[in-house]
Amino acid sequence: MKRKHLKRVVAGAFAAVMARSGISFPQANVHAEEKGNELRLWYDEPTSQGTNILGAGSGYDTDEKNRWQQHTLPIGNGDMGANVYGEIASEHLTFNEKTLWTGGPSESRKDYMGGNSTEKGQDGASLKNIQKLFAEGKTSEATAACNNLLVGISNGYGAYQPWGDIYFDYKDITEKNATEYQRDLDLKTAISTVSFKEDGTQYTREFFMSHDDDVLVARLEAKGSEKLNLDVRFPSKQGGKTVAEGNDTLKLCGALTDNQMKYASYLTVKADNGSVTGSGDKLTVKDASAVTVYLSAATDYKNAFYNEDKTEDYYYRTGETDEALAKRVKETVDKAVEKGYKEVKATHLEDYQELFNRVSLNIGQTVSEKTTDDLLKTYKDGSASEPEKRQLENMLFQYGRYLTIASSREDSQLPSNLQGVWNSLTNPPWSSDYHMNVNLQMNYWPTYSTNLSECALPLIDYVDSLREPGRVTAKVYAGVESKDGEANGFMAHTQNTPFGWTCPGWAFSWGWSPAAVPWILQNCWEYYEFTGDTEFMEENIYPMLKEEATFYNQILTEDKDGKLVSSPSYSPEHGPYTAGNTYEHTLIWQLYEDAAKAAEVLGQDTELAAKWKENQSKLKGPIEIGDDGQIKEWYEETTLDSMKPQGADPAGHRHLSHMLGLFPGDLIAQKEEWLQAAKVSMDYRTDNSTGWGMGQRINTWARLGEGNKAHELIQNLFKGGIYPNLWDTHAPFQIDGNFGYTSGVSEMLLQSNMGYLNLLPAIPDVWADGSVDGLIARGNFEVDMDWAKTSLTKAEILSKNGGECEIGYPGIAKAKIVDSKGAEVTVEKVSEDRIKFNTTKGETYTMTEIPERPVKAPANASAIYKDNTAIVTFDAVANAEKYVVYASTDGTTYNKVGEVEGTEYKAEDFAEGTTYKVAAVVEGKEGEKTSKITPEQLAVTNKIDDRDSRIEYSSGWGNWGPQEGQYEKTEKYSNTVGDTAELYFYGTGVRVIGMKIQTAGHLIYM
């Protein structure tokens, strides 16, 4: 990648400017908490005393491990991370550096080649045979061959590793005597503090991770009669030896046993008005009023496929000696020590706040007096006030931005992984790796729209680095070869590591996913869409798009109808193996779309782009509608239940793979028919998910314009997917869900994927009054908005690149638009709800006098019928006085047939073929009508079990596992008061038959 790494240069230049200009620095005392700070996570007990909630999940099988993921507070600078426990007598931090990985090339794996198996792949012969079997209709044989041949190996995969632990063992503090305890993480400053009183002395600690100086800083203070007397320890999690070097420094250097990766770290302690001495593996502080600790770390990892003279591949090392690596790290610490605490902190705040302060959100939040864990608890049980709920929702939105800045900076060597940059386990769940069948993509969904585009650069770097090893995989498994200087195509699949692991997984059923590359390339292409940086796109993004589109030109095959299919295909992570499916074809369609657009912008590869468009038009599907009005997940699908795999139920599956053309893609929104079909599929998939699955659902419903539905999922996420430290849980902790939530909130407020700025497209009723500043739309437009009663009252648009701006909002053609000088802007009216106008780079345009938004249509409208009676049901609309019902016999002309005050309409003169629409009336004004409601014939069913897709479960329900002997995972259960199971039926009653477990639960029929 042709991009300058500016981190160290900028830091040095900024320090020099400050020295000359006489900028004043903060006082030397630690960060004081801001009163009335709605973006402060805070707690009144240490991690060791917090209450664990929800499940622990894989890997966190002890109370101590579980507390780390549920209660500790994360800080980071993109390359390093730490988690603060906030203990009283023995403070504890876990420490990470993002490149410390096992796996990859090593002395014991001299033939390492990224997991590829030439024996299995046979240079594409296996794939071609499988494609032939599918074409001949020999599905069983093809499936068996997929399982046997389109797989990689597992040896050398490795895992992200914890570096070590930092302890501050106080000699004069007794935990039981501490009072007025607080610990916090201030999202406005990226500083975590711990404070308490004991024996008349105020003890305060401050922790932050400086990006520009590349150090973790801890500032410990005592104000009162007592001084600081403590030991500082820094034990390794990798078997390395920590030794005191001189009187004030701990050195922890070594090499991983698995792959001989070198690592080096230095921790230096400076005391105010006291002494520091070193002995053995610790430093001892005596009689200090304050202590400052500086820590930095690095490895000899380098994301380079070849060594410098290209004599070795799968290299991934700098080639540094132990001494050179140690010297590099020691110099980093020494420079920070020389600058001193005040200047390092000032630099940190300047750097962090320039990014974080770009976006602010007001959705009616307050500043609750409750601790964050209590606030979460009351949100879950419903006792929190509405402004308190808004505080938590806003905090989680900004937390996602904070975690982005902390785990992925413009010069980070690697992107954020499954856990960002934080990990406490040597064998973390899923290796804390890079999963590319939703997780890595979701990590970067909010990056552009929430004004942090530079934080996406490590992802683009990383995807680019997959090309060299991916060409090996393309040759082994697809028979596509790139000779020296050629870029004929590369492959990568579900999971990746920092060591060019691009092979399929060691099981086809989760590990085969070549379309993961087109999917992750969407994230890369969006950098250009949002920034408009054509030069960067030409040098760094278009080559990847071009190579991958060229790859698909070579591996797509024709089916019997002459349509192009990607064979074999698999919809993550369930269902049959087929010749093409919606997941793969939607992503290939988007790849061709973006590659052709890039070629057009650059004026390059005209003939090649024409071929891409031709192949795009010949793709099977990509979107097909099934017999139940749903978007098919598999092209062989008829009704929703027709492809149900044995032992699984797609109705509640966590993945939404067939919805990628809706979000994050652009395809489904091109046709209203497809949008309505997407709603059918989403309803069928249910809201029953956790973690990233809930995050994906929030984004997808937001794209459908269903703000209240998206907010319902937000509520479910808080109730079943967030730990006390606001980390998302799958379970266990995975950071993607945090980013998915932040992206979802952004999508509810602003969308731009369809070529125009769609303002407040999915604003929920509970965010009735509010504002947002700093969101970014494609075309590099920065958007500020104010709204009242969910209606837009003012919008300011900063055109950062110039060019045409198109706006969508109900009635926007009647709005007044002026530039920064107050001059009225000439606009072109596309429709009553759409306008466009030319903009000047750097100019701000203000819209006022915007018509009030029409009352929203009732959500979740549906209907059933039996004989001549139809029942139409829908959700209530806030403050609705009544509802107007319309009917049509031709699906085009709708006439009013009745009014109801409740949320059910009964038609006793129903004729088959009749469809309905419903509108709410608020303050005498009739609102928008629902989409067409087609009644479904009531099926007479004597008995159904809990697997029936017509039963809608709230998010708290789960399935008993086979170890409990509960009917092979088919029995539903819930331990949460208030959980519901809904079944709409026509009849005289319903009887529920279940296990009798004393008085463990009961049902209330409504």
Which residue ranges define each predicted feature?
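Glycan-recognition surfaces in beta-rich domains, encompassing non-catalytic CBMs
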Residues: 935-1006
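Beta-strand-rich modules
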Residues: 907-925
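Structural beta-strand segments of beta-rich domains
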Residues: 216, 793, 803-805, 868-872, ...
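Sec-dependent signal peptide cleavage junction
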Residues: 20-33
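Aromatic-residue-lined binding/catalytic grooves and analogous aromatic/hydrophobic interfacial grooves
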Residues: 33-508, 528, 549, 585, ...
